[in-house]
Design a protein with these regions (language model features):
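Thiamine diphosphate
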Residues: 1-126, 133, 141, 339-348
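Peripheral docking tails and interdomain loops at the edges
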Residues: 302-351
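Short helix-loop-beta junction
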Residues: 39-44, 222, 260-274, 317-318
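Conserved thiamine diphosphate
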Residues: 115-168
Length: 351
């Protein structure tokens, strides 16, 4: 079945096919259609929708539902995402699967409702307290708003971790055709750890507190070991990169601009290609290094350089110090979007 829907609506459809039981949320532009869609479709399919009194309540309601073994989700935008950071840390600390969708808008402060990718650091590195991070995916189309929401639930369940679907206001509002899955994901069995009120789960304990420092350190190391194993699930894609002299690195909506930029440059005789991380955490370092080795690298992003810094860091960690040092950034902020003309002009300066 194919539907012509907004990216935000595609998120709700993906959540339903992933088997999401409960949606807790508070509407905020430009993510409000996710709450609207959940309010409409969840009850129709026997699922639960709760409009919370605020974003802080939403994420803590998710903690309770996840602790009871229910698949749950919330969605928000910049200011609301900030309010959820403590709760996401608690989810990570208790190793609870849950999905948070952030439709990034311009900031800081109230900002405006136009697109940015400026929430990169809290979405990817963990914006709350402690040594944690989420499994973070970055869709680039309405189709992927559905598909990667499903993946986020699968990875949250697999790794017992909060997962973030990181998109922006442009992706949330644009409309495209979305092919829906043929069937719903099977319900996972959480009885080995969840507190479900049954005899077999009565001794399960969900917590994130370790009063003994040695035990707290041991648990922290357990999390870091888990995050290292998560790297096996890193995803990326390349486009026209095999013979490229310049590699354009971008994710989300910026990756679509990057593809058109590469095509435009090639039409003018400049061999350009693209690398797109699909997961931002874990970051596909090895794949990036393979694509970037010996090439000029340019980043397109809607931020002040947070993503470009991560590209440099991952290239340097992969032993490509020269490529890392040469990374150039073309960006816009405040709700402005990089144009293909901007990117083509910047690329010509790099080569």
């Amino acid at each position: 079945m194919v539907k012509f829907v907004k990216g935000n609506e595609a998120v709700v459809m993906g959540a339903l096919y992933a088997g999401c039981d409960l949606y807790f949320g508070y509407p905020i532009t430009p993510a409000s259609e996710i709450a609207h869609g959940a309010a409409k479709w969840f009850p129709m399919l026997g699922r639960t929708f709760v409009q919370a009194e605020c974003e802080t309540a939403s994420v803590n309601m998710m903690f309770g539902a996840a602790a009871a073994g229910k698949l749950c989700m919330t969605a928000t935008s910049g200011p609301g995402f900030s309010l959820m950071q403590e709760g996401i840390s608690y989810l990570a600390g208790a190793e609870l699967p849950a999905v948070v969708v952030n439709i990034n808008r311009a900031g800081p402060g109230l900002g405006n409702v136009y697109p940015e990718q400026s929430d990169y650091t809290p979405a990817v590195k963990g914006g709350g307290h402690g040594n944690y991070k989420a499994f973070t995916v970055a869709p680039a189309s309405a189709q992927e708003m559905c598909d990667l929401t499903i993946l986020a639930f699968r990875m949250a369940t697999k790794w017992r971790t909060p997962a973030v679907v990181f998109a922006d206001g442009l992706q949330g509002q644009m409309m495209e055709s979305v092919k829906l899955p043929d069937s719903e994901d099977a319900k996972p069995d959480f009885s080995d750890w969840a507190a479900q009120g049954e005899a077999k789960t009565r001794t399960n304990l969900v917590k994130s507190i370790f009063l003994d420092a040695a035990q707290q350190e041991e648990f922290n190391q357990k999390l870091q070991d888990k995050y290292a194993k998560m790297e096996a699930d890193a995803l990326s894609e390349t486009y026209l990169a095999d013979d490229a002299g310049i590699l354009i690195v971008a994710y989300g909506i910026s990756s679509r601009i990057a593809r058109t930029t590469a095509e435009t440059l090639r039409a003018e005789g400049i061999k350009a290609g693209c690398f797109r991380p699909i997961t931002l955490s874990p970051f596909p370092r090895e794949a990036l290094a393979a694509a970037a080795k010996g090439r000029k690298v340019m980043v397109i992003a809607l931020d002040a350089g947070q993503f470009a810094d991560d590209v440099r860091l991952n290239l340097a960690k992969a032993g490509l110090g020269q490529e890392a040092a040469g990374v150039e950034l073309v960006s816009r902020m405040g709700g402005q979007v990089v144009t293909v003309d901007d990117a083509v002009a910047a690329a010509k300066k790099v080569v």
